[in-house]
Amino acid sequence: MSHANPVQFINGQWQAGLGHDVSSSNPARNEVIWQGKTASKDQVNDAVLSARQAFESWANISLEARVAVVTKFAELLAENKDALATTIALETGKPKWETTGEAGAMVAKVAISLKAYNERTGTVENPMPGAKAFIRHKPHGVVAIFGPYNFPGHLPNGHIVPALIAGNTIVFKPSELTPRVAQEMLKLWEQAGLPNGVINLVQGEVETGKALASHKLIDGLFFTGSSNTGHILHEQFAGQPGKILALEMGGNNPLVVKDVSDIDAVVHDIVQSAFVTTGQRCTCARRLFIEANEQGDAILARLIEVTKNLTIGYYDDEAQPFMGSMISEKAALSLVDAQAKLLALGAKSVLDLKHLEVGTGFVSPGIIDVSDIIADIPDEEYFGPLVKLYRYNDFDKAIDEANNTGFGLSAGLLSDSEASYNHFFTRIRAGIVNWNKPITGASSAAPFGGIGASGNHRASAFYAADYCAYPIASVEAEKVSLPETLTPGMKF
């Protein structure tokens, strides 16, 4: 069946895709909620050209005029927050309590981005003899933005808002798993009064993404997603130093527990680190280090008890669940497969991760002890509620193993000892390091990013302003004049 729904937004016009049929389903109930056609290569080209045509006028209007449009978008977000939260929940399977928070974070992002623009990329003036020195910033031009499915509103919004404030124009390619959320977002930008071509939406799968990423007329690409895709983009951009590439990828994140008095508080933070958003946050704890002693045994026993009792359910249940569905049945089965492979290597199941309902993304959280097979464990991000358990005797060796990864996004220590945290902080390699807080907790008022396979030193959140504009250094005087002292060897 062919779907001529106008799901592409190019040069201010909604139009049907010219590619093949695609659809999006609610992963909790296996119901189709969106249908359309992918953007063709020609449509991607049209989107880039329209962004290129719109760039000069958008970049050259006053900052106040750009801010007015972005502020109007924030107002529309606030007015439509509940509807957007429902759409996010419907398409991702996340509980409504969580998607309401995501929609709220999208509203707050505008004020934070304005503050970041002024603090990090505003204009700085310094006096110097006979002149003034200025630091100003200019937008890059046309930027491609690739969004993920786990936070399909908040994370691309974290690229889009600062990029527009800086004066860039955009071609946005959302995850093919969350096209409906992207479409609702773009309708709000349209209502906010963005000029035609300033933001464009191209819906599609891998082919659409390749056509956009490889387009010669884009000046940069901002990506949030898997490490595998990020590495492909990095290779594709090699030899193009004139293009800005900002990558925010995943992590194989360690959470270490040492010498704690409040076991319930520790278990709470472990659960929030490993299983919130059904384990589908890039900052989720993938590796849990617990001491091999009596206290460690007590912590593990309580963790198993609490995890078994976590409520799993539909996003719209009146009594809201802790965990909803994963993004798809395919994603759920990939976690079941990952668990099976670890068991085949010799790991021991502490709590089985189970696929709960055929045709859906529902799984139960799992804990698997890998203490005896450390040398054989693949350095992979299992993007879901499956945490690998390491029992340890030596704190420094635990930190060594925590660092034994090519990733470097988030890490944390749960400990009553500040000295232990200071030691941990000094040695651990990650872009986000927390003490006695879940490692999934991050602030939009701080940078967000990792090292190694987790990113390319282009931190987002508050530091997104840095990759949305480039600095211009100027020395300026009102008229040309001879210096008081001539350079040796010159005569006038």
Curated annotation (Swiss-Prot):
Q: Which positions in this protein are listed as binding NAD(+)? A: G225, S226, S227, N228, T229, G230
The record's section on Gene3D superfamilies has: Aldehyde Dehydrogenase, Chain A, domain 1 (3.40.605.10), Aldehyde Dehydrogenase, Chain A, domain 2 (3.40.309.10)
Gene Ontology molecular functions: succinylglutamate-semialdehyde dehydrogenase activity
What's the catalysed reaction?
A: N-succinyl-L-glutamate 5-semialdehyde + NAD(+) + H2O = N-succinyl-L-glutamate + NADH + 2 H(+)
> Which biological pathway?
Amino-acid degradation; L-arginine degradation via AST pathway; L-glutamate and succinate from L-arginine: step 4/5
Keyword Secreted assigned to the entry: answer is no
| Classification via InterPro entries | Ald_DH/histidinol_DH (IPR016161), Ald_DH_C (IPR016163), Ald_DH_CS_CYS (IPR016160), Ald_DH_CS_GLU (IPR029510), Ald_DH_N (IPR016162), Aldehyde_DH_dom (IPR015590), SuccinylGlu_semiald_DH_AstD (IPR017649)
HAMAP family for the chain: Aldedh_AstD
The entry's function note states: Catalyzes the NAD-dependent reduction of succinylglutamate semialdehyde into succinylglutamate.
Under which name does UniProt file this protein?
N-succinylglutamate 5-semialdehyde dehydrogenase
Q: Which organism is it from?
A: Colwellia psychrerythraea (strain 34H / ATCC BAA-681)
The gene name reads astD
